[in-house]
Every structure is written in structure tokens, then in C-alpha cells.
Amino acid sequence: VEVAEPIVITIDGPGADTVAYGHLQIRLAPFARAAVVLDHRGSGTYADNVEFVVGDSAHLTVVAIHDWADDAVHVTAHHASVGRDAVLRHNAVSLGGDLIRLTGTVRYNAPGGDAELLGLYFADDGQHLEHRLLVDHSQPNCKSNVVYKGALQGDPATDRPDAQFGLPEAGLGLM
């Protein structure tokens, strides 16, 4: 089975000063191909658990967009289970929100799995964007590629003007 168009799932925040919890599971049957876009937006506090089960020889592409309102707090765990000779392409883009924490894990269930985790973030002054990843290579002949890139935009007049460059007095400044 091949899904020709991306499946777009929009997750709206619960609203200012409101908390909500979610759980989403996306399963691909063996030999299936699909792309899923998770579009996060709105305000409030939202915590969720997202599971990706990629069957044997299946191919799943995920794009997770975190473009929350300035007051939003989002704590999310993305867990991927990758089958024999299966392919996972996970792309995370974090742009908005007050605090965004994404914890991603990949577990290979059989030999030959292939996972690529790509991330991009752009943080303004005062934003906390955190991505923590773990790829468990517990099966033979599996491969992974993890690349995260980001840009920080801050106000040098803040109480931590050297935060983006290290601490010069400790010899940690970057030139």
C-alpha cells in the first residue's frame, strides 16, 4: 500500500492557561509507504506521546512542525519502532512556543533498519527549544543518520549576554 499524498494531522493547542494531553499512534503495514505531517499550533500547555510503528520493509516519512504561539508549552515524546529492512525519515522543525521539548527514540526490531533524524530550530530570545534523541542500535546491520541544526536570535542586553558564545572569563568563548 502506498499513500500518494501526505497525511496532515493538525494539533491545535488547548488555549491559553489550559492543559491537554494526547496520544497518537501511526502504524505502517509491511511494505507500505506513507508520509505524515504533524502540524502543531495554537497556545496553552500540551503534552503528548507519539508512536510510529514501521512494519518490515515499510517506508515512513514524518515531518513534525512546532509552530506554536508565544505562550505555548509543548512536551512531546516520539517513539519509533523500526522493522526489518524498514526506513524511517523523521524531520522536526521547531519555530514557535515558549518551551518546546521533543524527546525522540528509535528502536530497531530486526536487522536492516534505516533511520534518519533531521532537525531544524530557530529560537528567539527567551525561548527554550530542546531536542533529545536516542537511537538504539540493538540489531545488526542497521544504520542511522542524525543531523540537527539551529539558529539563535537573542538580545545581547539580557542578563546573560555571553550565553550564545560561552563564558569568556572561563576561556570558553568562541572566536
Language-model region placement:
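Conserved beta-strand/loop scaffold segments within soluble protein domains that form the structured core
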Residues: 1-175
